[in-house]
Amino acid sequence: MMTYLSKQFSKLLFGQLLFLFIGNLLLKPVQAYPIYAQQAYANPREVTGRIVCANCHLAQKAIELEVPNSVLPNQEFEATVKIDYDLNQKQLLGNGQKGGLNVGAVLILPEGFRLSPNSRSPFFNTYSEQLPNVIVIGPVPGEKYREIHFPLKAPDPTTNKQVHFVKYSIYAGGNRGRGQLYPNGQKSNNAPVLASVNGVIEQIRENEVVIKTDQGDLVSQAIPAGHTLLVKQGQKIQNEQPLTMDPNVGGFGQAEKEIVLQNPTRLKTFIAFCVTVFIGQLAFVLKKKQVERVQASEMN
Protein backbone atom coordinates (compact mmCIF):
# COMPACT_ATOMS: atom_id res chain seq x y z
CA MET A 1 0.00 0.00 0.00
CA MET A 2 2.77 2.40 0.95
CA THR A 3 4.64 1.54 -2.25
CA TYR A 4 1.55 2.30 -4.32
CA LEU A 5 1.05 5.67 -2.59
CA SER A 6 4.72 6.50 -3.06
CA LYS A 7 4.46 5.80 -6.78
CA GLN A 8 1.31 7.92 -7.10
CA PHE A 9 2.94 10.75 -5.17
CA SER A 10 6.02 10.55 -7.39
CA LYS A 11 3.85 10.71 -10.53
CA LEU A 12 1.93 13.68 -9.15
CA LEU A 13 5.13 15.51 -8.21
CA PHE A 14 6.68 14.79 -11.60
CA GLY A 15 3.54 16.04 -13.35
CA GLN A 16 3.57 19.30 -11.39
CA LEU A 17 7.26 19.88 -12.08
CA LEU A 18 6.72 19.16 -15.78
CA PHE A 19 3.78 21.58 -15.84
CA LEU A 20 5.84 24.33 -14.21
CA PHE A 21 8.76 23.73 -16.57
CA ILE A 22 6.62 23.85 -19.70
CA GLY A 23 4.66 26.82 -18.38
CA ASN A 24 7.90 28.67 -17.74
CA LEU A 25 9.05 28.02 -21.29
CA LEU A 26 5.75 29.23 -22.70
CA LEU A 27 5.67 32.36 -20.58
CA LYS A 28 9.21 33.49 -21.33
CA PRO A 29 8.48 34.77 -24.86
CA VAL A 30 5.54 36.75 -23.49
CA GLN A 31 7.57 38.30 -20.71
CA ALA A 32 10.49 38.87 -23.06
CA TYR A 33 8.47 41.01 -25.51
CA PRO A 34 9.70 44.51 -24.63
CA ILE A 35 10.04 47.47 -26.91
CA TYR A 36 12.83 46.17 -29.17
CA ALA A 37 14.56 49.53 -29.09
CA GLN A 38 15.23 49.12 -25.37
CA GLN A 39 17.38 46.09 -26.13
CA ALA A 40 19.37 47.62 -28.97
CA TYR A 41 19.76 51.34 -28.26
CA ALA A 42 20.98 53.16 -25.17
CA ASN A 43 19.13 56.32 -26.25
CA PRO A 44 15.90 56.22 -28.26
CA ARG A 45 16.60 59.53 -30.01
CA GLU A 46 19.52 59.86 -32.39
CA VAL A 47 21.58 63.05 -32.75
CA THR A 48 19.72 63.75 -36.00
CA GLY A 49 16.42 63.87 -34.09
CA ARG A 50 15.23 60.59 -35.56
CA ILE A 51 13.61 58.21 -33.06
CA VAL A 52 15.15 54.75 -33.40
CA CYS A 53 11.78 52.98 -33.73
CA ALA A 54 11.84 54.16 -37.36
CA ASN A 55 14.76 51.79 -38.01
CA CYS A 56 12.40 48.80 -37.72
CA HIS A 57 9.05 50.38 -38.64
CA LEU A 58 9.95 51.52 -42.15
CA ALA A 59 6.59 52.88 -43.31
CA GLN A 60 5.67 56.42 -42.24
CA LYS A 61 2.30 57.24 -40.70
CA ALA A 62 1.68 60.53 -38.90
CA ILE A 63 0.83 60.84 -35.22
CA GLU A 64 -0.36 63.78 -33.09
CA LEU A 65 1.06 65.01 -29.79
CA GLU A 66 -0.91 67.21 -27.40
CA VAL A 67 0.63 68.86 -24.32
CA PRO A 68 -0.20 72.01 -22.30
CA ASN A 69 1.50 75.23 -23.36
CA SER A 70 2.91 75.69 -19.86
CA VAL A 71 3.01 74.03 -16.45
CA LEU A 72 4.01 74.98 -12.91
CA PRO A 73 6.56 73.19 -10.70
CA ASN A 74 5.25 69.89 -9.29
CA GLN A 75 2.11 70.21 -11.39
CA GLU A 76 0.60 66.99 -12.70
CA PHE A 77 -0.49 67.17 -16.32
CA GLU A 78 -1.18 64.93 -19.29
CA ALA A 79 0.44 64.38 -22.67
CA THR A 80 -1.65 62.65 -25.33
CA VAL A 81 -0.27 60.71 -28.29
CA LYS A 82 -2.87 60.02 -30.98
CA ILE A 83 -2.14 57.01 -33.19
CA ASP A 84 -5.00 56.93 -35.65
CA TYR A 85 -5.68 54.18 -38.21
CA ASP A 86 -8.53 52.36 -39.93
CA LEU A 87 -9.96 49.82 -37.50
CA ASN A 88 -11.06 47.66 -40.43
CA GLN A 89 -7.45 46.98 -41.37
CA LYS A 90 -5.85 43.69 -40.35
CA GLN A 91 -2.13 43.03 -40.11
CA LEU A 92 -0.11 39.93 -40.90
CA LEU A 93 0.79 38.17 -37.66
CA GLY A 94 3.89 36.12 -36.99
CA ASN A 95 2.01 32.87 -37.67
CA GLY A 96 0.79 34.04 -41.09
CA GLN A 97 -2.75 34.74 -39.92
CA LYS A 98 -4.49 38.14 -40.04
CA GLY A 99 -5.25 40.00 -36.83
CA GLY A 100 -5.83 43.41 -35.31
CA LEU A 101 -3.09 46.01 -35.16
CA ASN A 102 -1.14 46.64 -31.99
CA VAL A 103 0.25 50.07 -31.12
CA GLY A 104 3.16 51.42 -29.11
CA ALA A 105 4.58 54.81 -28.20
CA VAL A 106 7.62 56.47 -26.68
CA LEU A 107 7.57 59.87 -24.99
CA ILE A 108 10.89 61.68 -24.52
CA LEU A 109 10.54 64.28 -21.78
CA PRO A 110 12.93 67.05 -20.71
CA GLU A 111 15.32 66.37 -17.85
CA GLY A 112 13.47 66.23 -14.53
CA PHE A 113 10.02 65.52 -15.96
CA ARG A 114 8.70 62.15 -14.83
CA LEU A 115 5.80 59.74 -15.06
CA SER A 116 3.27 60.74 -12.41
CA PRO A 117 3.68 58.73 -9.19
CA ASN A 118 -0.13 58.51 -9.09
CA SER A 119 -0.21 56.55 -12.36
CA ARG A 120 -1.71 53.12 -11.80
CA SER A 121 -1.40 51.84 -15.36
CA PRO A 122 0.80 48.72 -15.60
CA PHE A 123 1.58 49.44 -19.27
CA PHE A 124 3.84 52.48 -18.76
CA ASN A 125 7.55 51.85 -18.21
CA THR A 126 10.66 53.96 -18.16
CA TYR A 127 13.04 53.34 -21.05
CA SER A 128 15.91 52.50 -18.70
CA GLU A 129 17.24 53.30 -15.25
CA GLN A 130 19.52 55.88 -16.82
CA LEU A 131 16.62 57.57 -18.68
CA PRO A 132 13.68 57.88 -16.26
CA ASN A 133 12.40 60.82 -18.32
CA VAL A 134 11.70 58.54 -21.31
CA ILE A 135 8.40 56.66 -21.06
CA VAL A 136 7.42 53.71 -23.27
CA ILE A 137 4.23 51.75 -23.71
CA GLY A 138 3.38 48.81 -25.92
CA PRO A 139 2.61 46.73 -27.67
CA VAL A 140 -1.03 47.19 -26.64
CA PRO A 141 -4.29 46.58 -28.57
CA GLY A 142 -4.87 49.38 -31.05
CA GLU A 143 -8.64 49.20 -30.68
CA LYS A 144 -8.37 50.44 -27.09
CA TYR A 145 -5.30 52.65 -27.28
CA ARG A 146 -5.58 54.79 -30.40
CA GLU A 147 -5.13 57.66 -27.94
CA ILE A 148 -2.48 57.13 -25.26
CA HIS A 149 -2.65 59.48 -22.28
CA PHE A 150 0.63 59.82 -20.37
CA PRO A 151 0.15 61.07 -16.76
CA LEU A 152 3.17 63.25 -16.01
CA LYS A 153 4.62 65.46 -13.30
CA ALA A 154 6.68 68.62 -13.78
CA PRO A 155 9.93 69.12 -11.83
CA ASP A 156 10.70 71.86 -9.30
CA PRO A 157 13.81 73.95 -10.07
CA THR A 158 14.11 74.94 -6.41
CA THR A 159 14.91 71.33 -5.50
CA ASN A 160 16.45 70.15 -8.80
CA LYS A 161 19.28 72.42 -9.90
CA GLN A 162 19.45 70.70 -13.30
CA VAL A 163 16.05 72.18 -14.17
CA HIS A 164 15.31 75.81 -15.05
CA PHE A 165 12.30 77.99 -15.77
CA VAL A 166 12.61 77.88 -19.56
CA LYS A 167 10.94 76.47 -22.66
CA TYR A 168 11.51 72.75 -23.27
CA SER A 169 10.83 70.35 -26.14
CA ILE A 170 8.89 67.10 -25.80
CA TYR A 171 9.33 64.40 -28.44
CA ALA A 172 6.96 61.53 -29.17
CA GLY A 173 7.02 58.53 -31.46
CA GLY A 174 4.18 56.13 -32.16
CA ASN A 175 3.65 53.10 -34.33
CA ARG A 176 0.74 50.99 -35.37
CA GLY A 177 1.33 47.44 -36.52
CA ARG A 178 4.39 45.22 -36.58
CA GLY A 179 7.80 46.26 -37.86
CA GLN A 180 9.54 45.13 -41.02
CA LEU A 181 12.96 44.60 -39.45
CA TYR A 182 14.34 43.35 -36.17
CA PRO A 183 17.18 45.28 -34.48
CA ASN A 184 19.68 42.67 -35.72
CA GLY A 185 18.72 43.49 -39.32
CA GLN A 186 16.72 40.33 -39.93
CA LYS A 187 13.48 40.83 -41.86
CA SER A 188 10.15 39.99 -40.27
CA ASN A 189 7.38 38.35 -42.26
CA ASN A 190 5.67 41.76 -42.39
CA ALA A 191 7.75 42.88 -45.37
CA PRO A 192 7.64 42.02 -49.08
CA VAL A 193 9.85 39.19 -50.32
CA LEU A 194 12.41 40.44 -52.85
CA ALA A 195 14.16 38.39 -55.50
CA SER A 196 17.76 37.61 -54.58
CA VAL A 197 18.96 37.05 -58.17
CA ASN A 198 18.19 37.82 -61.80
CA GLY A 199 16.45 35.06 -63.68
CA VAL A 200 13.16 33.39 -64.60
CA ILE A 201 10.50 31.92 -62.32
CA GLU A 202 11.06 28.20 -62.84
CA GLN A 203 8.50 26.83 -60.40
CA ILE A 204 6.00 28.08 -57.81
CA ARG A 205 5.32 25.83 -54.84
CA GLU A 206 3.16 26.28 -51.78
CA ASN A 207 5.75 28.08 -49.64
CA GLU A 208 8.58 28.80 -52.04
CA VAL A 209 9.50 30.14 -55.45
CA VAL A 210 12.26 28.53 -57.53
CA ILE A 211 14.23 30.93 -59.73
CA LYS A 212 16.46 29.81 -62.60
CA THR A 213 19.38 32.22 -62.84
CA ASP A 214 20.98 33.46 -66.03
CA GLN A 215 23.78 30.97 -65.36
CA GLY A 216 21.32 28.07 -65.18
CA ASP A 217 21.42 27.60 -61.40
CA LEU A 218 18.24 27.03 -59.39
CA VAL A 219 17.67 29.30 -56.40
CA SER A 220 14.83 28.63 -53.97
CA GLN A 221 13.26 31.49 -52.02
CA ALA A 222 10.88 30.87 -49.12
CA ILE A 223 7.51 32.62 -49.17
CA PRO A 224 6.09 33.18 -45.66
CA ALA A 225 2.51 32.15 -44.99
CA GLY A 226 -0.04 34.87 -45.63
CA HIS A 227 1.85 36.56 -48.48
CA THR A 228 0.29 37.20 -51.90
CA LEU A 229 2.49 36.44 -54.92
CA LEU A 230 3.03 39.06 -57.61
CA VAL A 231 4.88 36.80 -60.05
CA LYS A 232 3.92 33.80 -62.15
CA GLN A 233 5.76 30.84 -63.62
CA GLY A 234 7.93 31.72 -66.62
CA GLN A 235 8.15 35.40 -65.70
CA LYS A 236 11.54 37.11 -66.05
CA ILE A 237 12.56 38.99 -62.91
CA GLN A 238 15.34 41.26 -61.73
CA ASN A 239 17.35 41.21 -58.51
CA GLU A 240 15.52 43.02 -55.65
CA GLN A 241 12.22 42.84 -57.56
CA PRO A 242 9.24 42.19 -55.23
CA LEU A 243 7.96 38.63 -55.44
CA THR A 244 5.03 39.32 -53.09
CA MET A 245 2.78 42.23 -52.23
CA ASP A 246 3.77 44.39 -49.27
CA PRO A 247 1.69 42.99 -46.36
CA ASN A 248 2.39 45.95 -44.09
CA VAL A 249 -0.59 48.17 -43.22
CA GLY A 250 1.00 50.03 -40.30
CA GLY A 251 3.67 52.65 -39.88
CA PHE A 252 5.63 54.88 -37.53
CA GLY A 253 5.49 58.62 -36.95
CA GLN A 254 6.99 61.17 -34.62
CA ALA A 255 6.02 64.63 -33.39
CA GLU A 256 7.46 67.44 -31.29
CA LYS A 257 5.86 70.06 -29.05
CA GLU A 258 7.17 72.80 -26.75
CA ILE A 259 6.21 73.34 -23.13
CA VAL A 260 7.16 76.16 -20.75
CA LEU A 261 8.01 75.53 -17.11
CA GLN A 262 6.57 78.66 -15.53
CA ASN A 263 8.09 80.48 -12.57
CA PRO A 264 5.23 81.02 -10.07
CA THR A 265 6.85 84.20 -8.73
CA ARG A 266 7.21 85.62 -12.22
CA LEU A 267 3.63 84.65 -12.99
CA LYS A 268 2.35 86.36 -9.83
CA THR A 269 4.41 89.45 -10.65
CA PHE A 270 2.98 89.54 -14.16
CA ILE A 271 -0.57 89.20 -12.84
CA ALA A 272 0.07 91.98 -10.31
CA PHE A 273 1.48 94.17 -13.09
CA CYS A 274 -1.59 93.55 -15.27
CA VAL A 275 -3.90 94.39 -12.36
CA THR A 276 -1.92 97.58 -11.66
CA VAL A 277 -2.09 98.63 -15.31
CA PHE A 278 -5.82 97.90 -15.40
CA ILE A 279 -6.46 99.95 -12.25
CA GLY A 280 -4.32 102.78 -13.62
CA GLN A 281 -6.23 102.78 -16.91
CA LEU A 282 -9.54 102.67 -15.07
CA ALA A 283 -8.50 105.59 -12.84
CA PHE A 284 -7.42 107.55 -15.92
CA VAL A 285 -10.78 106.97 -17.63
CA LEU A 286 -12.72 107.94 -14.50
CA LYS A 287 -10.60 111.07 -14.07
CA LYS A 288 -11.13 111.99 -17.71
CA LYS A 289 -14.90 111.58 -17.30
CA GLN A 290 -14.78 113.78 -14.21
CA VAL A 291 -12.85 116.51 -16.04
CA GLU A 292 -15.29 116.39 -18.94
CA ARG A 293 -18.23 116.83 -16.55
CA VAL A 294 -16.52 119.81 -14.87
CA GLN A 295 -15.79 121.42 -18.24
CA ALA A 296 -19.36 120.84 -19.36
CA SER A 297 -20.77 122.46 -16.20
CA GLU A 298 -18.47 125.51 -16.60
CA MET A 299 -19.60 125.98 -20.19
CA ASN A 300 -23.22 125.92 -19.11
From Swiss-Prot:
- Keyword Thylakoid listed? The answer is yes
Q: Which topology term describes how it sits in the membrane? A: Single-pass membrane protein
Keyword Cell membrane listed? no
Any single GO molecular-function term of the entry would be: heme binding
GO biological process terms on file: photosynthesis
Q: Where is the signal peptide?
A: 1-32
What InterPro entries is this protein classified in?
Cyt-f_TM, Cyt_f, Cyt_f_lg_dom, Cyt_f_lg_dom_sf, Rudment_hybrid_motif
Top-rank lineage group of the source organism: Eukaryota
Q: Where does heme bind?
A: Y33, C53, C56, H57
Q: Where are the transmembrane segments?
A: 267-287
Q: Name one GO cellular component term.
A: chloroplast thylakoid membrane
Q: Which keywords belong to this entry?
A: Chloroplast, Electron transport, Heme, Iron, Membrane, Metal-binding, Photosynthesis, Plastid, Signal, Thylakoid, Transmembrane, Transmembrane helix, Transport
Q: According to its UniProt entry, what is the function of this protein?
A: Component of the cytochrome b6-f complex, which mediates electron transfer between photosystem II (PSII) and photosystem I (PSI), cyclic electron flow around PSI, and state transitions.
What is the similarity comment for this entry? Answer: Belongs to the cytochrome f family.
Protein name per UniProt: Cytochrome f
Source species: Cyanidioschyzon merolae (strain NIES-3377 / 10D) (Unicellular red alga)
